[in-house]
Amino acid sequence: MPQKSSENFFTELFKFILIAAAIVFPIRLFVAQPFIVSGASMSPTFNNGQYLIVDELSYRLQSPNRGDVIIFRYPKNPKEFFIKRIIGLPTETVSINGNAITITKADGKTVALSEPYVANHGNGSANSYQLKEDEYFVMGDNRPESSDSRVWGTLPRDNIVGRAFMRLLPLNSIGFFPGSLSTVDTGTPVQ
């Protein structure tokens, strides 16, 4: 009799594993995935070793917005994943002059970007970047420590994996949409 019981156990265990895989695999593949922050480029918003959940679904339904914190495949090596903040949107011109960033939108209006999330601007240079359709300009919040669009160019839309949806670790900083700002796009008009 004990043999029948162990066969039942293994059959039930196999069914459980199959059902769990059928539920978890599609979610992991199409909806959300884990991401561990590596480095100081997004400090103080995100610190090295923090554990995030990436929302992969939203950008299939809508376009990324300025100020969104995104995870993407590094254009120079698609096996590497980076985390940065969106500064410039498709067809815009991003102008950097020292610590000041201005955005010239597709309609010709220019705004000075307000960046309360940046603790260290570093020594900014003067440069201008014209974005094409489906290109984004991304930067780290800790500018001196960030390898971003200023260094390697614009980010193709197809490289974006998703946005930071939830910070899970450390436990004292758990939260949804960490690093998001609702007023980032309302920069001050430039005369």
Model-derived features: where do they sit?
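Soluble "head" domains of membrane/secretory-pathway proteins
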Residues: 1-15, 26, 30-31, 35-36, ...
